[in-house]
Amino acid sequence: MLLLLLLLLPLCWAVEVKRPRGVSLSNHHFYEESKPFTCLDGTATIPFDQVNDDYCDCKDGSDEPGTAACPNGSFHCTNTGYKPLYILSSRVNDGVCDCCDGTDEYNSGTVCENTCREKGRKEKESLQQLAEVTREGFRLKKILIEEWKTAREEKQSKLLELQAGKKSLEDQVETLRAAKEEAERPEKEAKDQHRKLWEEQQAAAKARREQERAASAFQELDDNMDGMVSLAELQTHPELDTDGDGALSEEEAQALLSGDTQTDTTSFYDRVWAAIRDKYRSEVPPTDIPVPEETEPKEEKPPVLPPTEEEEEEEEEPEEEEEEEEEEEEAPPPLQPPQPPSPTEDEKMPPYDEETQAIIDAAQEARSKFEEVERSLKEMEESIRSLEQEISFDFGPSGEFAYLYSQCYELTTNEYVYRLCPFKLVSQKPKHGGSPTSLGTWGSWAGPDHDKFSAMKYEQGTGCWQGPNRSTTVRLLCGKETVVTSTTEPSRCEYLMELMTPAACPEPPPEAPSDGDHDEL
């Protein structure tokens, strides 16, 4: 197409056909000077001398192509050496040069420079550059197609290899799973036995400590040390009160002793201790760890003056109050609950014996082997899924877009960095830091029916505030390099991105032989 345009540009050698001003070459046969003129819409026929007489006779304005008489008429710019052009007849002789050859201002007094040759030269250079890009891009496109053919064959071979190896790996997994389960059975039994023995030892130790607490409480309650705890001795501990009046009555004490008046050590532990253990408070104060006093900086005090007689009398009076306070401070300490022994190393489960540890090590080795092969199987299955997806993906008529599959491209603007990962996602993030926002994930090819692979659609991006989810259309343009050239937001939350790629280059027409005699515009 581009070369065809280049061939149409050289018009300097074309034969000039006589026709009224403003008439195109394709319409000259309607304007024969020897015949009356019929309006192009067929509504009227007029003498030929009324064509371009600056009076509008035809409704369609076709009788005044070279004047501004008809508001709906059109003037044809020949623009020899460049592209012909139609302009509104109202713009003829308006003092503005609309045609590059200046023919529209033939009677306005405005002098128009003929710029058609220069415009044609620049147009030709631009088209030649575009044609060169198309040729080079298409050359690269053919390479991309061949590379995908080779890569696809390699991936298919790799897929077959993985699918064949998968069965062998699945068999290994099942074999090692059975070996693991076989090794874990004695491991569980050995661990359970070890824990059971330790828990029994802990229970025995706990019972022993409870007996020691009960014995200690019995000794404290047995004030006369006769080997028996009586009702009176039990009543010395009001905290054992059961009716909430703050005192342990004789009836309450007797109820605690199961109706007896006293109890020995054995009965005390079997019957009494369980009822009082949570309320009982020991008379032995706990050993407090001295807290070091904080030393405050000494303040300089003024010198002490000898007291006056009145001050001496005032100082003598508080002495009695101080003595009373000292007596209160000497009151016996409150009863304390018996202190349970702090946890020791004996309460931690001991290490396994050599035989049990050997069983555990064997089970662990079986687990490690199984997990390693199972992990390899999962990685193989993921590779198979990935290869199947890539091989079956629609990468264009000949797979020319396949090379984009594992790539990402960025475009940095004043505010954002846009990132396109073809066939995966589009995102944007603030240029100066911040989390990315999804502008859509791969949806489908979105070009028109006759050019399906000219655009991509990415959908279901991050939702806009009180709006739809973001989406992006990517237009694919022919270029020698792969680069994102622009990103815009023509509609709210709908983005348009342009990607230059050799894969979008069409096949150019054959180059026409150059004509040395007619190379001027």
From Swiss-Prot:
Which parts of the sequence form the motif Prevents secretion from ER?
518-521
Residue ranges, compositional bias (Acidic residues): 241-253, 308-331
Signal peptide location = 1-14
Q: Which Gene3D superfamilies match?
A: EF-hand (1.10.238.10), Low-density Lipoprotein Receptor (4.10.400.10), Mannose-6-phosphate receptor binding domain (2.70.130.10)
**Keyword Electron transport (UniProt):** no
Q: Which domain of life is it from?
A: Eukaryota
Consequences of knocking out this gene: Knockout mice exhibit early embryonic lethality by 11.5 dpc. Conditional ubiquitous or kidney-specific knockdown results in polycystic liver and kidney phenotypes, respectively.
Enumerate the subcellular locations listed in this protein's record, separating them with semicolons. Answer: Endoplasmic reticulum
Q: How does it assemble?
A: Heterodimer of a catalytic alpha subunit (GANAB) and a beta subunit (PRKCSH). Binds glycosylated PTPRC.
The entry's function note states: Regulatory subunit of glucosidase II that cleaves sequentially the 2 innermost alpha-1,3-linked glucose residues from the Glc(2)Man(9)GlcNAc(2) oligosaccharide precursor of immature glycoproteins. Required for efficient PKD1/Polycystin-1 biogenesis and trafficking to the plasma membrane of the primary cilia.
Q: What is this protein called?
A: Glucosidase 2 subunit beta
| Lineage, highest ranks first | Eukaryota, Metazoa, Chordata, Craniata, Vertebrata
Gene name of the record: Prkcsh
